[in-house]
Structures are given as structure tokens and as C-alpha cells.
Design a protein with these regions (language model features):
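Hydrophobic transmembrane architecture of multi-pass small-molecule transporters
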Residues: 35, 258-317
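Membrane-embedded alpha-helical segments of multi-pass transporters/permeases
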Residues: 37-42, 100-103, 203-206, 272, ...
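MFS transmembrane alpha-helix packing/gate-lining sites
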Residues: 5, 170-174, 258, 262
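Residue-level hotspots within transmembrane alpha-helices of multi-pass secondary transporters
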Residues: 7, 11, 68, 176-177, ...
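Transmembrane core module of solute transporters
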Residues: 20-21, 26-32, 58-60, 71-72, ...
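Helix-loop-helix hairpins in multi-pass membrane proteins, especially solute transporters
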Residues: 1-59, 169
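Hydrophobic alpha-helical segments of secondary membrane carriers
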Residues: 1, 130, 254-258
Length: 317
């Protein structure tokens, strides 16, 4: 799933969007979910219940409210102009309150929902920091790739999906090789190599223009995905290398939560910057859109757009 998801996801999502509608990107998860649940019920052995272990419902509820409100604020913040909207302010207050009660309760109860002893392990704490960096930087960049390919480069939805899938192909190749490479190289060497590849490809993307070749995009995406594969497996291995067995369940869930929240924060930041940049550039260009601009008096412009009418100005805008 980790390897095939990044390959099949963009291609399948693009095909469903182009053939049916974007709603089917979500509907398609229903049959896969049913198959997964059925497989768990049929093939997975039942584990023994630990009756002496109580579930921390208060900590779970407080954390769910904190994370849920934060995610909602991050998703809707750009649409509602962030702190100018009372909805975003209320969501952030609810999120802060949820996190406050979660931490206050966790430090005072005997069996908290999350064992904070996991952060005392240096390898795990370091891996967590790297996960935050990857979530903020890489996944936010991936979120901008699809609108870049479609809006700026003019590729159809299906072509954009196939281009995004090449990154997953690079990750697939790296994960097939990394287990054998770990027999010859240290985990930190592979992680450093993977981060270097990702940094190089991201830097190369800053020089892309509207006429960038498809071959360049494919090579860049494959190398970037290969770098991610070199980082992901050794980083996960290093995170749990010295973590006690009874803390590994908490560690696994914490890595997943932190990566998802970090990616949401990163995506919100880049979308906010994109929106502000678009607004600023639009304002500069709009200053030159008037009937007295000589460039707009050319026959190929005046034949299709009349700037003296509201419809013409709206079309130009």
C-alpha cells in the first residue's frame, strides 16, 4: 500500500475526474474500504484483550478536538481570510483548548492516551523532526504540482495524473532497493542521500518555465520519489531502533499524526503564499488594462475583446 498508493492514486484520481467527476475520487474509497474490512475480519487473528489496560477516553477526545479543529482551520483559513473570519478564530480557540486539556490531562493521569516517554528516545525524537520537515516541505510541494501542470502548463487532467505517478514510481524503486542497501550503508547515510536528492530536485523545479519538457518533469519526479524512498524506510527503522517494545504502538501513531498535521500546515502555507502572490500580480497587471494601452489596440485583441464594455473588461480580467 505504501508503495502502490503514490503510483495508482494520482493516475486513478485523474482518470475518475476526467471520465466522471471529482466526486468519484472520494466514492472510490468505499469499495476498497469494504474489501479491507472484510479481509481483516477473515484473515487477521483476534488478539487477546488486556483487561487491565483502560482506554483514556478524555485524552483521546481532547486530542481529537484539538487536531480536528486545527485541520478545519488550516483547510478553510485561506478561503475565509484567516483571522479576519470569526469561524477561523473560533476553530483556533477550540483547537488550543483541546490541546491544553489534552496535555494537562496527560501529565496528571497514570495512563495517558499518548505515552510521552517516547520523546525521551533520541532516535525517535530526531526521526520525528525529520518527519515534520518532510511533511511541511515535500508534501506541500506535491500539492502544488497538480494545479501547476494543469493551469500553468496546460496538460489535461489525465496527463497531469500520470506525471504525478512517476514520483510514486521512483519511491517504489527505492523501497525495493533500500532493504538491501541498508546491509552496506548506515541509515543516516541513506537518509542524507535521500534528502540531498529531494533538495536538488526541488531546487531544479524553481527554474521550470511554461515550456519545460515532459522528459525533464518525469526525470525530476522519479529522482525526487527515489530520494523519498531512501529517506522513508531508514528513517522509520531508526525511529524504532532503540524505542522499547511497549512504546512502539504510541510511537507509530505519533509519527503518523505529526506527518499529517505537518503536511496540512505546509500545504496551508504554500496555498496562502500562492494566493497572495496571485493577488499581487493580478493587481499589477490590472493597472495596465485600459482602453488607452497601445498593446491592447492590436487587431487580434480588439477583434475579440472590447474594453469599453463590462463584458470585455471581465473577459480580460
Amino acid at each position: 500500500g505504501v508503495m502502490m498508493g503514490p503510483i495508482m492514486g494520482p493516475s486513478l484520481g485523474a482518470w475518475l475526474t476526467e471520465t466522471y467527476s471529482w466526486h468519484w475520487v472520494f466514492f472510490v474509497n468505499l469499495p476498497f474500504g469494504i474489501i479491507t474490512v472484510a479481509g481483516l475480519l477473515i484473515f487477521m487473528d483476534e488478539t487477546k484483550l488486556n483487561t487491565g489496560l483502560q482506554f483514556d477516553w478524555f485524552g483521546f477526545t481532547a486530542l481529537a478536538i484539538g487536531i480536528g479543529s486545527l485541520q478545519l482551520a488550516l483547510d478553510r483559513g485561506e478561503q475565509l481570510d484567516w483571522l479576519e473570519s470569526w469561524e477561523i478564530v473560533i476553530e483556533l480557540i477550540v483547537s488550543g483548548t483541546g490541546f491544553y486539556y489534552f496535555f494537562a490531562h496527560s501529565f496528571t493521569t497514570k495512563r495517558p492516551f499518548v505515552q510521552f516517554a517516547i520523546f525521551k528516545d533520541r532516535n525517535f525524537a530526531t526521526a520525528l523532526i525529520f518527519m515534520v520537515v518532510i511533511g511541511v516541505v515535500l508534501f506541500s510541494t506535491m500539492a502544488l504540482a497538480s494545479p501547476l501542470f494543469q493551469n500553468a502548463y496546460g496538460y489535461p487532467i489525465l496527463t497531469a495524473g500520470l506525471l504525478l505517478a512517476t514520483r510514486g514510481g521512483g519511491t517504489f524503486m527505492a523501497m525495493m532497493m533500500v532493504s538491501r542497501l541498508m546491509s552496506y550503508f548506515e541509515a543516516r547515510t541513506l537518509i542524507a542521500t535521500g534528502l540531498s536528492l529531494m533538495a536538488f530536485t526541488l531546487y531544479e523545479m524553481t527554474g521550470w518555465t511554461a515550456d519545460v519538457a515532459v522528459q525533464t518533469i518525469v526525470i525530476n519526479s522519479v529522482v525526487q520519489g527515489f530520494g523519498l524512498g531512501l529517506v522513508f524506510v531508514p528513517l522509520s527503522t531508526a525511529a524504532f531502533m532503540t524505542l522499547p517494545n511497549h512504546l512502539r504502538t504510541d510511537g507509530t501513531s505519533m509519527l503518523t499524526v505529526v506527518r499529517n498535521v505537518a503536511s496540512s500546515i505546509g500545504i496551508s502555507i504554500v496555498i496562502a503564499q500562492l494566493t497572495r502572490g496571485t493577488t499581487r500580480v493580478h493587481a499589477v497587471l490590472a493597472e495596465h488594462i485600459n482602453p488607452f494601452n497601445n498593446a491592447l489596440q492590436m487587431p487580434n485583441v480588439t477583434s475579440s475583446i472590447n474594453l469599453n464594455t463590462d463584458m470585455g473588461r471581465a473577459t480580460m480580467d
